[in-house]
A protein has these predicted regions:
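Short amphipathic alpha-helical segments, especially helix-boundary/capping motifs
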Residues: 37-41, 62-65, 124-130, 151-157
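Basic, amphipathic alpha-helical segments enriched in Lys/Arg and hydrophobic/aromatic residues
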Residues: 132-195
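Polybasic low-complexity intrinsically disordered regions
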Residues: 1-105, 109-111, 116, 172-177, ...
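N-terminal cationic amphipathic segment used for targeting or macromolecule association
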Residues: 5-7, 121, 169, 183
Length: 195
C-alpha cells in the first residue's frame, strides 16, 4: 500500500472569511485540524486523527501509521515538507516503508545513523543533485494530489463542525469519512487519454 498523508483545518466557531474581512474578525475563531492518510490505489481513507489547531503535523504521523494494521505492508509514505522531521522518518522506516518527503529548503544532512536518517539524507542528496522539480517528478511526489482531492471531498460535506464538544466533533468527522469511504467503494471512474 502507498500511503498519502496530509492535514487541513475545519472551522468550529467564528464567522466566515468574508465576514471577518469586511467587519473585522471576532475575538474567538476556533479550528480543528484533521489529519488524513489515504491508500493511493483504493483512494480509501485508512487513517484519521483530529487535533486542535495548535498541534503541528509531524507529531501526528506515528499515530496515523499505528492505525494501519501491523500485518499490512506499507510500501511508501508520501507527505509534504512539514513532516521532514527525525521522528517521522524513523516511524516510516520502522514500518519498512520508503519516505517521499521533500527536505526543507535549508536542510542539512543528519548525523545520527538510523534507518530514517539514512533515507532522509539520500533524499536530500537526490534533491540537491537533481533539483527539487526533477526530484518531485522522479519520486512520484505528484501522487500527493490525491490526498488534497480527498480533503476537498471532506470539506464538500461541510466546511464547519456543528458539534461543540471535542469528542462529538471527532465522531462527526468519523461519520463524514465513513460516508466518503462508502462513496469511494461504489467505484472510481476510470479516465483514459484521448488522442
Amino acid at each position: 500500500m502507498h500511503l498519502l498523508i496530509d492535514s487541513t483545518g475545519i472551522k468550529v466557531e467564528g464567522e466566515g472569511e468574508w465576514h471577518a474581512r469586511k467587519h473585522g474578525g471576532p475575538k474567538r475563531r476556533v479550528w480543528r485540524k484533521i489529519h488524513l492518510g489515504i491508500d493511493e490505489e483504493a483512494l480509501e481513507i485508512r487513517a484519521v486523527e483530529v487535533t486542535g489547531s495548535h498541534i503541528g503535523d509531524a507529531p501526528i504521523l506515528p499515530d496515523l501509521l499505528d492505525q494501519i494494521p501491523q500485518d499490512q505492508e506499507i510500501a511508501s509514505v508520501t507527505t509534504d515538507g512539514a513532516y521532514d522531521r527525525r521522528k517521522c522518518h524513523d516511524a516510516i522506516a520502522d514500518r519498512g516503508a520508503h519516505a517521499f518527503i521533500p527536505p526543507r529548503k535549508n536542510a542539512k544532512p543528519w548525523r545520527t545513523i538510523t534507518a530514517g536518517a539514512v533515507a532522509r539524507n539520500e533524499a536530500l542528496r537526490a534533491t540537491k543533485y537533481l533539483g527539487r522539480a526533477l526530484w518531485r517528478r522522479w519520486s512520484g511526489y505528484h501522487r500527493r494530489s490525491h490526498v488534497e482531492t480527498k480533503m476537498q471531498c471532506v470539506k464538500l460535506l461541510g466546511q464547519r463542525l456543528m458539534a461543540r464538544d471535542f469528542d462529538r466533533q471527532v465522531a462527526e468527522l468519523q461519520v463524514r469519512i465513513a460516508v466518503l469511504n462508502g462513496y469511494t467503494a461504489l467505484g472510481i471512474p476510470v479516465t483514459e487519454a484521448v488522442g
